[in-house]
Amino acid sequence: MKYKNDIIAAIIVIAVLGIIGFGYLRATDNEKVSDSIKFSQEYTNVSKDNPFVYKTDKEIIEILKHGTGVVYLGFPECPWCQGYVGYIEEIAKKTNVSKVYYLNVLEIRKNNTKEYQEIVSILNDYLDYDEEGKKRVYVPLVIAVKDGKIIDCDSETSKDTKGYETPEEYWKNEDLDGLKVKLEKMFSETGKNVCTTDCNK
């Protein structure tokens, strides 16, 4: 009788652990899916299975200083960002870049936070000056980084839209193939998304 009770107790414990484990795996998977879905809701030119992963300003700084991968800085209220992210997704998938680290810079830039200033300092050589003569993150901006070294950046439509009213009009008349070639080279040179710290989680 005691043996039978022990077996029943063991089965119950295993079942409970299985349910907890399944719930954890499902929650983890939902977190990944939610980044993609959330991004596709904010940026309507990407698919629901896009590679964009939300990161904090501190996590982006860590990636830029020590990591490897592709970083995208922008915000959904920017129509030029909306027009750009579809090309980032296309090239990321083509080059097997599974994650594009995303930071919405609107508020930190507006408030000139300490973290924003650090991002500006890291990207200093790749940024343009604003009207006051200070370096500024203009968006959209995509950055390829490997082992904490900036490989290259692209911000083609972030400051000079050459008089075009919309991103669609711009890319219809400008060198879209050239952009794709540049992004493909940048993304390929990152190799793969591997950080030397926890920044790729």
Residue spans for each PLM region:
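Short active-site neighborhood of thiol/selenol oxidoreductases, capturing the structured segment around
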Residues: 64-76, 88
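Non-catalytic, surface beta->alpha helical segment in thiol-disulfide oxidoreductase systems
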Residues: 132-201
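A short beta-strand-turn-helix
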Residues: 50-68
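Typically the conserved alpha-helix immediately C-terminal to a functionally engaged Cys/Sec
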Residues: 80-96
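Thiol-based oxidoreductase modules, predominantly thioredoxin-like and allied folds used
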Residues: 51-54, 73, 97-121
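N-terminal targeting signals for export/organelle localization
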Residues: 1-51, 192, 200-201
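Loop/turn elements at helix/coil->beta-strand transitions in domains of secreted/extracellular proteins
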Residues: 66-71, 96-99, 139, 146-147
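The canonical Cys-X-X-Cys-His
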Residues: 78-81, 142
